[in-house]
Amino acid sequence: MKRILALLLAMMMVLSLAACGGNKETPSGSGTTDPGTSQQGQTGSGTTKKADGAQMDAATDHANSYTDVQTLSGLNTIGKPAGYKYKGSGEAGETRHIRFAPETDSFTVDSLDSYAAALWNLCIDTAKDGELIRYRLSGEHTVYENLSDTRKVYEDSGLVAYVWWYELNGEYLRLQLKQSADDGVIELTIEPYGSAE
């Protein structure tokens, strides 16, 4: 019995030492997006620990989520908001979303605003004719001139959101970016919205 306990203790010590090791997290650079999260930056192990299966699964999910969103959106250099870390992702039909959580307990809407500005510029560079619009089923679309035209604050919940549409490869895509007032989580959603023909 003592041998079994000693063996179990030794295995636990080895596993805990392995879990404590691994790559050190490096701080992200300044700016609104972290290029280390782009598709090109997903080849390494990043900040995950090799001995922790859950961490590795999250890293794989992270890389796949970025690839899915990049492919759907045409925005090949999507990064993460500065001061944020990957939290999770999901899909519903063809719609894809990625969530980011603040790296610290404090957060501000400035992070959302800066990230929205970076995505706005990427969409302008990607969109047909460089136009970001308010999509209407009637076909009479409003072209947004300024990022501030797409920003909405929901007074009852404190939620801040940006929404715009853009045309890519003959299809309208809806981009929504929102931040929870409770925990600061930022969610980016890309949704196919119908043919532009």
Positions of predicted regions on the chain:
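Positively charged n-region of N-terminal signal peptides that target proteins for export
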Residues: 1-4, 8-9
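N-terminal leader/targeting segments
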Residues: 21-98, 104, 195-196
